[in-house]
């Protein structure tokens, strides 16, 4: 009887010692693995240059907020630059290889061959309808025209700023603008905009809501129109919807990866709608040369300074995106 009890106790003690040994072995092994992993994590980062990519936002999200995607200072060798120019350039420059020449000159400023793109547009009106800004950095050249100052100003306001836009059904609803950042942006082949302000009884002020001919015309046969009316008052609108799309837009802030260079003119265009504020000239520059070769030489010389006042972004912009988030 006593022998059986001693044997049971001895077996229990041996099992306890064995289990304790197993636990110590497992603990030592885990310590080794954890310490080795931590050692590797501490030692390797200084020797590895990684890039942290952000979340791929849906189309309804912000398309133009600059996202810093790199853990190190970014080199121009990894960026793309688009230069948009009017067709007047090709009418003046007869050299068929002028783009290759400029690419070689940009190479001397740190921009690799193939990272600089030259894109031609016919006129400001057509460019405003479909502003394809695909590069990391976008520079738009606008030749000054005294007869097109307002068109240039509206286009500059459109592409230099980020807008959040929603559809408008002008046949069914009244609309009002809440503040200075709230505008109605119309784009199309031919936009004619008429407005009728309403009082608190929804009766027209100086116009009849049932007769569009009594509405006040604020734009006529335009491709791009930014409409500003009195804030806080409902308006009935009449729009040529067959050839024009109008959106209720809110200016969210600057689009930092776009700059405009005005070619010619005595002063830089003022794109600020508020008459009480100083003109907005950020990322709006002027080159006063008569020849396009001289213009491009100046851009090559100052390209890195121009880019320094801009911010690289991670998404492109085209006209389809405009109708959701510009």
UniProtKB/Swiss-Prot annotation:
The keyword Glycoprotein applies. Keywords: Calcium, Capsid protein, Disulfide bond, Glycoprotein, Host endoplasmic reticulum, Host-virus interaction, Metal-binding, Outer capsid protein, Signal, T=13 icosahedral capsid protein, Virion. Gene3D superfamilies: Glycoprotein VP7, domain 1 (3.40.50.11130), Rotavirus outer-layer protein VP7, domain 2 (2.60.120.800). N-glycosylated. The N-terminus is blocked possibly by pyroglutamic acid. Residues 1-50 form the signal peptide. Disulfide bonds join 82-135, 165-249, 191-244, 196-207. Glycans are attached at residue 69. One of its GO terms (molecular function) is metal ion binding. It is found in: Virion; Host endoplasmic reticulum lumen. Residues 237-239 are annotated as: LVD motif. The keyword Transferase does not apply. InterPro entries: VP7, VP7_1, VP7_2. Residues 253-255 are annotated as: GPR motif. Ca(2+) 1 binds at residues 95, 206, 214, 216. Ca(2+) 2 binds at residues 177, 228-229, 231, 301. One of its GO terms (cellular component) is T=13 icosahedral viral capsid. Residues 165-167 are annotated as: CNP motif. Belongs to the rotavirus VP7 family. Calcium-binding protein that interacts with rotavirus cell receptors once the initial attachment by VP4 has been achieved. Rotavirus attachment and entry into the host cell probably involves multiple sequential contacts between the outer capsid proteins VP4 and VP7, and the cell receptors. Following entry into the host cell, low intracellular or intravesicular Ca(2+) concentration probably causes the calcium-stabilized VP7 trimers to dissociate from the virion. This step is probably necessary for the membrane-disrupting entry step and the release of VP4, which is locked onto the virion by VP7. Some rotavirus strains are neuraminidase-sensitive and require sialic acid to attach to the cell surface. Some rotavirus strains are integrin-dependent. Some rotavirus strains depend on ganglioside for their entry into the host cell. Hsp70 also seems to be involved in the entry of some strains. In group A rotaviruses, VP7 defines the G serotype. Homotrimer; disulfide-linked. 2 Ca(2+) ions bound at each subunit interface in the trimer hold the trimer together. Interacts with the intermediate capsid protein VP6. Interacts with the outer capsid protein VP5*. This is Outer capsid glycoprotein VP7. It comes from Rotavirus A (isolate RVA/Human/-/RK9/XXXX/GXP[X]).
């Amino acid at each position: 009887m006593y022998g059986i009890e001693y044997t049971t106790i001895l077996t229990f003690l041996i099992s306890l010692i064995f289990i304790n040994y197993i636990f110590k072995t497992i603990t030592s092994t885990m310590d080794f693995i954890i310490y080795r992993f931590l050692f590797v994590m501490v030692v390797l980062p200084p020797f590895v240059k990684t890039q942290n990519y952000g979340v791929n936002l849906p189309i309804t999200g912000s398309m133009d907020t600059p996202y810093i995607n790199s853990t190190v200072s970014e080199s121009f060798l990894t960026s793309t630059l688009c230069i948009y120019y009017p067709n007047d350039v090709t009418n003046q420059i007869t050299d068929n290889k002028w783009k290759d020449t400029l690419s070689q000159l940009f190479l001397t400023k740190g921009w690799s061959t193939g990272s600089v793109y030259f894109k031609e547009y016919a006129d400001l009106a057509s460019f405003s309808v479909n502003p394809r800004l695909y590069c990391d950095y976008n520079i738009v050249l606008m030749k000054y025209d005294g007869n097109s100052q307002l068109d240039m100003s509206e286009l500059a306001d459109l592409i230099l700023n980020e807008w959040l836009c929603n559809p408008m059904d002008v046949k069914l609803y009244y609309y009002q603008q809440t503040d200075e950042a709230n505008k109605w942006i119309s784009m199309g082949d031919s936009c004619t905009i008429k407005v009728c302000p309403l009082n608190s009884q929804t009766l027209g002020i100086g116009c009849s809501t049932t007769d569009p001919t009594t509405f006040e015309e604020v734009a006529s046969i335009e491709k791009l129109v930014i409409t500003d009316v009195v804030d806080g008052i409902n308006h009935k609108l009449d729009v040529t919807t067959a050839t024009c799309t109008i959106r209720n837009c809110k200016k969210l802030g600057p689009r930092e990866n776009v700059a405009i260079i005005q070619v010619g003119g005595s002063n830089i265009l003022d794109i600020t709608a508020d008459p009480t504020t100083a003109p907005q000239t950020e990322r709006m520059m002027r080159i006063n040369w008569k020849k396009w070769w001289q213009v491009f030489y100046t851009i090559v010389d100052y390209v890195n300074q121009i880019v320094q006042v801009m911010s690289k972004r991670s998404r492109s912009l085209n006209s389809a995106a405009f109708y959701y988030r510009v």
